[in-house]
């Protein structure tokens, strides 16, 4: 018997990584899970190294980042690797979630892995926001001011919660201290949830492009899918290094290279690009509390997908109407991202409201309606046989 099967710990790892049975028809859209694991490892390694040289003090934070860039051996590489991996993390998780929505991987028996995945996504957004503040440039300061101020929309307790988050009456040294402590902790929390996600997925088994049960035709994870994952890992590293070495600031904001100054407001206050769709939803609602509720609901509404999708067939492989609807949803989400970075002026205000209505309508109206219509078509088709 092989050593990996004799030892109890190695046997458990072997059942998840090497000998794990997988459907035989998985395509490259199933490779984003391994890329997300790679992103998490890179973030942990670079983040711990950066924390050794970073100073979480309002007067020293910006200078400590510049010290890392100029004086620490390969500090520029570590800092840019950490910043760009955050962007690639979101690229991969958006692609991963989009694949799950398209192929119906949230349906029974994979409701638990999907729910844990949505929680991971929410934690990732919070972690990225706190990390962005730590640079303490202009956009960091005003981003923290604006985003934390949204909590004040909560009736009765809002103002007190904002002061608790800031550690005072404005963004300052206590804010950096607590954000740094939480930002250091959150990746380990994410790692725990990623492990829970993997356990839940191992219990239910992976879905496949056809949306059918694949118990009769499976392959071991190694060597078939491990080598398949390596192809996208190398492609990922190629794109990643191109950004780190040649365009490290392409996905960032130039205002964050200006030290934080509470007396000077930037021309426009926008979050990082990966949060722009939800920022557009926030701005589409004139009422402050309504905007906050809509922004949070835009994330949490993903949890109801297993309920609102009434289709008797998993995935969109054989559903042309659902394919078209999903295409509109993706285009709408990308348009929300564009609207999140433009100034609030006509016609962008109305366009943002239309896109927000379509976003929520997709989950609450269009998906249940289209899935019901397609069920009727499938039923009629089965009667003709």
Swiss-Prot record:
Comment on bound cofactor: Binds 2 heme b groups non-covalently.
Localization per Swiss-Prot or TrEMBL: Mitochondrion inner membrane
Give binding positions for a ubiquinone.
202
Q: Listed GO cellular component terms?
A: membrane; mitochondrial inner membrane; respiratory chain complex III
State the membrane topology.
Multi-pass membrane protein
InterPro entries to which the protein is assigned, alphabetical: Cyt_b/b6_C, Cyt_b/b6_C_sf, Cyt_b/b6_N, Cytb/b6-like_sf, Cytochrome_b, Cytochrome_b_C_euk/bac, Cytochrome_b_N_euk/bac, Di-haem_cyt_TM
Membrane-spanning parts: 32-52, 76-98, 113-133, 179-199, 225-245, 289-309, 321-341, 348-368
Q: Name one GO molecular function term.
A: ubiquinol-cytochrome-c reductase activity
Q: Which UniProt keywords apply?
A: Electron transport, Heme, Iron, Membrane, Metal-binding, Mitochondrion, Mitochondrion inner membrane, Respiratory chain, Transmembrane, Transmembrane helix, Transport, Ubiquinone
Which amino acid positions bind heme b b566, per UniProt? Answer: 96, 197
Q: Name one GO biological process term.
A: mitochondrial electron transport, ubiquinol to cytochrome c
Query: Which protein family is named in the record?
Result: Belongs to the cytochrome b family.
- Supply the name of the protein: Cytochrome b
- The organism named in the record is Yarrowia lipolytica (strain CLIB 122 / E 150)
Source taxonomy: Eukaryota, Fungi, Dikarya, Ascomycota, Saccharomycotina
């Amino acid at each position: 018997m092989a050593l990996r099967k004799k030892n109890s710990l190695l046997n458990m790892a072997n059942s998840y990584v090497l000998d794990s049975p997988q459907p035989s028809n998985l395509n490259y859209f199933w490779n984003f899970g391994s890329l997300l694991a790679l992103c998490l490892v890179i973030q942990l390694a670079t983040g711990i190294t950066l924390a050794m040289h970073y100073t979480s003090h309002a007067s020293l934070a910006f200078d400590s980042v510049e010290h890392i860039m100029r004086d620490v051996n390969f500090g520029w590489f570590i800092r840019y690797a950490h910043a760009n991996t955050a962007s690639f993390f979101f690229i991969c998780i958006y692609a991963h979630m989009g694949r799950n929505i398209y192929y119906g991987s949230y349906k029974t028996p994979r409701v638990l892995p999907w729910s844990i995945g949505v929680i991971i996504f929410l934690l990732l957004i919070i972690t990225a926001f706190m990390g962005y503040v730590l640079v303490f440039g202009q956009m960091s300061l005003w981003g923290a001011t604006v985003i934390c101020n949204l909590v004040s929309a909560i009736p009765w307790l809002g103002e007190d919660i904002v002061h608790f988050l800031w550690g005072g009456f404005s963004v300052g040294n206590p804010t950096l201290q607590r954000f740094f402590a939480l930002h250091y902790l959150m990746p380990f929390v994410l790692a725990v949830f990623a492990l829970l996600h993997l356990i839940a997925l191992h219990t239910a088994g992976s879905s496949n492009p056809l949306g059918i049960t694949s118990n009769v035709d499976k392959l071991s994870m190694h060597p078939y899918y491990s080598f398949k994952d390596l192809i996208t890992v190398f492609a990922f590293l190629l794109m990643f290094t191109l950004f780190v070495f040649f365009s490290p600031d392409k996905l960032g904001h130039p205002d964050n290279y200006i030290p934080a100054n509470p007396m000077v407001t930037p021309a426009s206050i926008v979050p990082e690009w990966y949060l722009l769709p939800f920022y557009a939803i926030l701005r589409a609602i004139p009422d402050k509390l309504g905007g906050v509720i809509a922004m949070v609901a835009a994330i949490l509404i993903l949890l109801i997908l297993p309920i609102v999708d009434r289709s008797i067939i998993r995935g969109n492989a054989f559903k042309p109407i659902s394919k078209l609807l999903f295409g509109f949803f993706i285009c709408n989400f990308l348009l929300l991202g564009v609207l999140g970075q433009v100034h609030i002026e006509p016609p962008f205000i109305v366009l943002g409201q239309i896109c927000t209505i379509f976003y929520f309508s997709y989950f609450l109206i269009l998906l249940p309606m289209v899935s019901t219509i397609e069920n009727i078509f499938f039923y009629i088709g089965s009667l003709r046989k």
